Amino acid sequence: MMKRILRPFQILYCIYALCIFACLTIISLFAMIFILPMGYRYLTIGIYKIGRYFSKTLYLFIGMRHQEIYEGVHHFNQAHVFVGNHNSYMDIPPIVQLKHQPIKPLGKFESSKIPLFGLFYRHIVIMVDRSNPEKRAQSLQNLKEALKNKISIFIFPEGTFSMTDEKPLKDFYNGAFKLAIEMQVPIQPVLMVDSVDRMHFSGIFTLSPGICRVVYLPTVYVDNYSLDDLEILKQQVHQMMDDGLRRYRKYPAS
C-alpha cells in the first residue's frame, strides 16, 4: 500500500533526475570543446576530470552519496585493470569517482547511439562492438594503448548486466584477465554494493536516493601468472568478488 502511495513521487523524482542528467551532459559537452586539442594522455585526464565533476554534481542534486571502503592497499600512481560487478546503470557514475586516478572504461558501442549523451560517452569510454571482429580487435589495441600511457582501464568481466537477485555474479569472460597478464598490470577488483538499490535493473523509474558504496578488494598482482594460468586467475578474482558481495549483501546460499 505504501509503495503505491509513494510511486507518483518516485516517478517525479526520476523525471527530475533525468533533467539534471541532461543539463549536466550539455555542460560537459561544452567543457570538452576546450580540451579536445590536447594530446592523448592529457585529453584522457581532462575528460576523466569532467566526468568526475559530472558524477559528483549529479549525486549532489539527486541525493546520492559516494563512499569508498578499502579492504587492501591501493596504489593510485600505478595503472590497473579495474574489474567490477555489473547489475545496474548506476554502476557507471562511481567509475569516474574512483579516486584519484584517470580511468578509461570499456563500454558498449550501442550506448553511443543515445541522443546527446552519446557524444559525451564516445570520449569517456573505449567502445567495443562485439558484433564486428575488426572493431573488437581495435578496442583491444585501445585498451593496451591506455595502459601503456599509465591510464587505468575498467572492465565489467560479466560482459553485461547480471539480471538476477539470486546470486552475486555471472561467469566472467577472459578478456580483462588475459590483458592484465599480457601487459603485466595488476588487477583491482571493486564491488558496486548499492547500485542495484539506487536503480534496479528492471527499469530507470526505480531510481532512488541513498548511499553508493564502492569496495576496493585487495589488489591481485599478476607477476607470477602466464597465459597458461588464465583460468586460475579468472576464477580466483571471481571467487574474491563473489565472497565480497556476500559479505555486504544478502543472497541465497550458494
Predicted regions and their residues:
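N-terminal membrane-anchoring alpha-helices
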Residues: M1-R65
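Catalytic core of membrane glycerolipid acyltransferases/transacylases, capturing the structured
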Residues: T25, L29-K49, F61, H75-P133
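Non-catalytic C-terminal accessory region of glycerolipid acyltransferases
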Residues: R4-P8, Q138-S254
